[in-house]
Amino acid sequence: MFFGMDKRTLYIIMAVLVIMSLGRYLGNTSALLSLVLTLPAVLIAITFHEFAHAFAADKLGDDTPRRQGRLTLNPLAHLDPVGSIMLVFAGFGWGKPVEINPRNFNRTVTMSKGEAIVSIAGPLMNFILAIIFTIINFAIIRFAPQFILSQIGIIILTLLQTTIIINVGLGVFNLIPLPPLDGSKVLSHFLSYKAKEWMMNNQFILTIAVFVIVFYTNIMGYISSYIMGGMIWVVDWIFGLFL
C-alpha cells in the first residue's frame, strides 16, 4: 500500500497525471530541452534526499540503511520509478524509501524523535542543495555576464535553475503530513495516539483530497515560489554585503 492505495491504483493515477502533463511538450522545443535538463536535476535531488535519510539514521545508531546499501550517493540505490517520473513531469515526487529500525537508535533520542529527525533530514537536504545552487546561479550571473549569453551558458543556467526548482518541489512535497511522506513522521512525533489513529483510518480520503488540492489549486507552486523567493532575497542580500 502506498498513500493508502494499492500499487495498481497508484500507477493508473500516475499514468493519467503524466499523460495530462505531456501535452505541454508536444511540438515545443524549449519545453523538450527543459525536460531533458530536468533528468540530472531529478537524479541530484532524489539521491541526496534519500542519502540524507540514510546518513541521519546511521548517525543515530541504526545501521539498517548501511547494511542495505543506502548509505551511498549512487542514484541507482535511491530511485523509485513512479516517484522519479512524477518529479520529472509534475515537479514533485519521491525516491525509494529508506528503511530504518528505530529500536536501533542510540539512547540520546526516543524512537519517535529519532524517526522525526531522520524524516526531516531529506527535505532539509533538498533545501540546502537549493540554496547552494542559488548561490552558484547568482555567482555566474554576477561574475560571468558574458558567459550566460552563450549557448552553453544558457544551458548551464537553465540546468541550475531547474535543479533549484526540483529540489524545492521535492522538499515541499515530502513535508506533506501524509504517510508515507516525511512530513507524516515529523507531525506524528507531536500528535496524540488518537490523532495518529484518525489519520491512519482516513489515509485514503486524505490522500485523494491532497492530490486534488495539489493539482487544481497549484498550492505547491505557491509555496515553492515563496521559498525560492526567500532564498533569492537572502542570497542577494549576502552578495550585497560582500560584493
Question: What do the PLM-derived regions correspond to, one by one?
Answer:
Residues M1-L243:
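Hydrophobic transmembrane alpha-helices and their immediate loop junctions
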